[in-house]
């Protein structure tokens, strides 16, 4: 609303990396939003499609948990990325990974790992917490114990249209159940581990597909990675990765 009233909002019908850089340059764009896949397309675009930025451009990214390496790649091009989190059912973003100045002293890799967190709630949201969905009790803030992200406040929908069963299931216990599995760090920052339907259970252990994807994305020859569960006779499920390699980068069997 603010840029529409006091500045300029540019909407793109298609993802065209060359056009994005041209518009940023032409209209002195200061902020833009895009899902992690769009940021990956920007960092992976040929140099001929990119323009050197005349000023820092601030980016909000949402729609999927971003791999930590994307923050480093975007920064090298002149972009400063902040991760935000929300759902259609919450009328948009309810958390942001607000930066603490004390983190400036950390090594770059650690900074990027923090930037990949979903963060803390916005002031207009009554509550964002991590609970055991069965007991409806908050999990320890240890950065390890996995629970489900629960949200409460007047930004949460009233329910699903003409679907009382789905509404009752999503709103049980007075909180909106997101279906996103996460941990909460001691500082209150939320970090998604997986969607509840995507978690890989191998030999009785929960394995986060997002964590594996994040690790794979750090390899210089990997453009993007997706990890899913594969049925296994011994372990029940094992991780299976699909990789899109960076063009002109060497890839070996290992």
Regions found by a protein language model. Name each.
Residues 1-30, 45:
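Conserved AMP-binding/adenylation subdomain of ANL enzymes
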Residues 24, 32, 153, 158-159, ...:
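AMP-binding/adenylate-forming catalytic core of the ANL superfamily
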Residues 47, 87-116, 124-127, 131-135, ...:
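Active-site loops of AMP-binding adenylate-forming
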Residues 55, 124, 221-224:
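Glycine-centered tight turns that cap/initiate beta-strands
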Residues 58-80, 90-93, 97-98, 123-124:
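Short gly/Ser/Thr-rich phosphate-binding loop of adenylate-forming enzymes
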Residues 63, 86, 119, 180, ...:
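Active-site glycine-centered loops adjacent to acidic/histidine catalytic or metal-binding residues
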Residues 112-122, 140, 170-174:
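Short Gly/Pro-enriched turn/cap motifs at secondary-structure boundaries
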Residues 121, 127-150, 186-187, 249-253:
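Conserved beta-loop-beta connector loops within the AMP-binding
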């Amino acid at each position: 609303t603010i840029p529409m009233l006091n500045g300029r909002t540019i909407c793109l019908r298609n993802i065209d990396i060359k056009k994005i850089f041209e518009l940023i340059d032409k209209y002195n764009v200061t902020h833009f939003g895009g899902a992690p896949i769009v940021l990956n397309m920007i960092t992976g675009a040929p140099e001929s499609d990119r323009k050197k930025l005349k000023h820092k451009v601030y980016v909000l990214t949402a729609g999927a948990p971003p791999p930590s390496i994307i923050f480093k790649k975007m920064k090298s091009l002149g972009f400063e990325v902040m991760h935000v989190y929300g759902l259609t059912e919450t009328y948009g973003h309810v958390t942001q990974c607000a930066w603490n100045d004390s983190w400036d002293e950390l090594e770059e890799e650690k900074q990027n790992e923090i930037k990949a967190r979903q963060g803390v709630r916005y002031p207009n949201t009554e509550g964002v917490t991590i609970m055991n969905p069965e007991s409806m009790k908050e999990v320890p803030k240890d950065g390890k114990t996995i629970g489900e992200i629960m949200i409460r406040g007047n930004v949460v929908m009233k329910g699903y249209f003409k679907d009382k069963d789905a509404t009752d299931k999503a709103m049980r216990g007075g909180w909106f159940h997101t279906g996103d599995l996460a941990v909460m760090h001691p500082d209150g920052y939320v970090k998604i581990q997986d969607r509840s339907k995507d978690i890989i259970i191998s030999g009785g252990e929960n394995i986060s597909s997002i964590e594996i994807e994040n690790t794979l994305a750090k390899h210089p020859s990997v453009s993007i990675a997706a990890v899913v569960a594969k049925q296994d006779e011994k372990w029940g499920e094992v991780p299976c990765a699909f990789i899109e390699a960076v063009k002109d980068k060497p890839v070996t069997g290992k």
